[in-house]
């Protein structure tokens, strides 16, 4: 089978297609014939040496796929050969075949294409784990989402609307701002044109927001704390501006704030399976009905993986990018 390999320098140009033996599914696992593989920020971070795979995981890039179940491992009961699925995978998605737990696969939502479905798991597992499990986001609350036009950001908008919360977002240009508002954001703030702290305080009449979902880190940490209301929650999922910063904790104590966060890949099979079950019952019907929308920026053949990563690194995209491995 084909799979993507990258060199020790981690450069975009170091990625290349190599031939390898297909993996074998173990107990409770399924082998998926990959038709599409989603591209995510952790893929770029792994290639650059900033997000190594956990012990036992495939070193091949790719954390989500959509395709056909090709083989069943021992004790598999939820799927049969030939079923079409989308799945969160522990690695190995940039390949013709990959293995994952049967409990991390979901059916293709009615009305969605395979390509659209391939772009769902990583973002939706992440936003559910952080906004529902960690932050306890609920109806009537205000949520500020940084990186609102990213795959994670758009999923967070959808989840906020689904639970009855009001999503506000920050983005990098006017086009992204308009897109996010059309997608469901209450307010979209172009951080290059205005101070998001001042704008949030203006919008909320100085009250602040209940939850902030942050993938920026760095200097944003103190700013995020300043716009959280009493008993607010700051959820950290990435650190594009760095994970180390000088920080004043006094506002955290005065406002009784919670600072939390999580990563998805190191979680146990059982933890991911629980999130999968929640998505299947709470989100998948909303995707099928059109209540929750998806956004696919582009589809790239496996040979164009470098081009797709460059687009991701440029942050000029809106929504998700996927690789196509089969027609």
What is the predicted function of each stretch?
Residues 4, 284, 289-298, 306-327:
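C-terminal capping/lid region of NAD(P)-dependent oxidoreductase domains
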Residues 93-96, 171-179, 244-249:
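Short, glycine/polar-rich helix-capping loops at beta-to-alpha or helix-loop-helix junctions
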Residues 118-193:
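Mid-domain Rossmann-like dinucleotide-binding core that forms the NAD(H)/NADP(H) cofactor-binding site
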Residues 21-38, 48-92:
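Glycine-rich beta-strand-centered segment in the early N-terminal region that forms part
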Residues 196-206:
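Short amphipathic alpha-helix with an adjacent loop that forms part of the alpha/beta core around
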Residues 78, 84-147:
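NAD(P)H dinucleotide-binding glycine-rich loop of Rossmann-like/cofactor-binding domains
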Residues 84, 142, 166, 232-233, ...:
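Short glycine-centered segments of the SAM/dcSAM-binding site in methyltransferase folds
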Residues 171, 219-291, 324-327:
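Glycine-rich phosphate-binding loop and adjacent beta-alpha segment
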């Amino acid at each position: 089978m084909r799979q993507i390999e990258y060199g020790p320098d981690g450069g975009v140009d170091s990625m290349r297609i190599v031939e390898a033996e297909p993996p074998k599914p173990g107990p409770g696992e399924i082998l998926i014939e990959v038709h599409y593989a989603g591209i995510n920020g952790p893929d770029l971070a792994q290639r650059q040496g900033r997000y190594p795979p956990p012990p036992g995981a495939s070193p091949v890039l790719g954390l989500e796929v959509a395709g056909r179940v090709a083989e069943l491992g021992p004790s598999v009961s939820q799927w049969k050969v030939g079923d079409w699925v989308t799945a969160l995978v522990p690695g190995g998605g940039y390949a013709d075949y990959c293995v994952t737990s049967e409990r991390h696969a979901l059916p293709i939502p009615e009305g969605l294409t395979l390509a659209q479905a391939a772009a769902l798991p990583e973002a939706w597992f992440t936003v559910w784990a952080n906004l529902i499990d960690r932050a306890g986001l609920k109806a009537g609350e205000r949520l500020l989402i940084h990186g609102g036009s990213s795959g994670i950001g758009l999923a967070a908008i959808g989840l906020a609307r689904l639970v009855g919360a009001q999503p506000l977002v920050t983005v990098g240009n006017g086009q992204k701002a308009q897109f996010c508002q059309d997608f469901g954001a209450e307010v979209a703030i172009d951080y290059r044109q205005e101070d998001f702290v001042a704008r949030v305080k203006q919008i909320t009449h100085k009250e602040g927001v209940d939850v902030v979902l942050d993938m920026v880190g760095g200097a944003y940490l103190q700013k995020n704390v300043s716009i959280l209301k009493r008993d607010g929650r700051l959820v950290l999922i990435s650190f594009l501006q760095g994970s180390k910063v000088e920080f004043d904790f006094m506002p955290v104590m005065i406002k009784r704030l919670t600072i939390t966060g999580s990563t998805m890949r190191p979680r146990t099979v059982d933890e991911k399976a629980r999130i999968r079950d929640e998505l299947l019952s709470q989100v998948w019907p909303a995707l099928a009905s059109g209540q929750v929308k998806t956004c696919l920026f582009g589809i790239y053949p496996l040979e164009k993986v470098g081009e797709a990563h460059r687009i991701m690194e440029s942050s000029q995209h809106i929504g998700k990018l996927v690789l196509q491995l089969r027609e």
